[in-house]
Amino acid sequence: QNAHPSPK
């Protein structure tokens, strides 16, 4: 799981 905003 990745609870971080995507750089796109």
Curated annotation (Swiss-Prot):
GO terms for cellular component: extracellular region. One of its GO terms (molecular function) is peptidase inhibitor activity. Belongs to the bradykinin-potentiating peptide family. It is found in: Secreted. It comes from Bothrops cotiara (Cotiara). This peptide both inhibits the activity of the angiotensin-converting enzyme (ACE) and enhances the action of bradykinin by inhibiting the peptidases that inactivate it. It acts as an indirect hypotensive agent. Its main location: secreted. Keywords: Hypotensive agent, Metalloenzyme inhibitor, Metalloprotease inhibitor, Protease inhibitor, Pyrrolidone carboxylic acid, Secreted, Toxin. The modification Pyrrolidone carboxylic acid is found at Q1. Expressed by the venom gland. This is Bradykinin-potentiating peptide 8a.
